[in-house]
Amino acid sequence: MDIRLLSKSFFVRRLGLDDVDIIYDISCKNEIFYEYHPPFVTKQSITEDMEALPPNKSYDDKYYIGFFENNTLVANMDLILDYPTEKIAFIGLLMVNILYQNNGVGSKIVCDTCVYLKELGYKKIRVGVDKENPQSTYFWSKNGFKIISEKEYNVMELVL
């Protein structure tokens, strides 16, 4: 996968340990997310997220990526390919910089990501949403995702 093709508007690259400070900066400002998804972010929790893998997945399938405008981190995404099954992509996190929220940037990133993943042959995209978080549920719903399972997290899915 060529991650640069996940967005038509932003420069996309993998994020690594050198990026923890800028990820932490945008994460800290997204306080509403952490009201529903405690504990509050730490630099260690970011590092752990970068390394976390679901069962039976390898780092070849994981893309912890940033979307940049000039040198500013606009959003970060944790994307797992072929999870939970083949031809389903799973977005474990999409965090949009608060300075870019409420103007369609997150939706544009989701739309571009969906278009590219469909070109690659993916059939569905799933996300896990904190059950009590109305802001996240609304965001994913307005982007065409439907709740397919309600447990601790709502699993939402978009058929491509």
Predicted segment positions?
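Active-site acidic-Proline motif in GNAT/NAT acetyltransferases
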Residues: 97-99, 103, 131-132
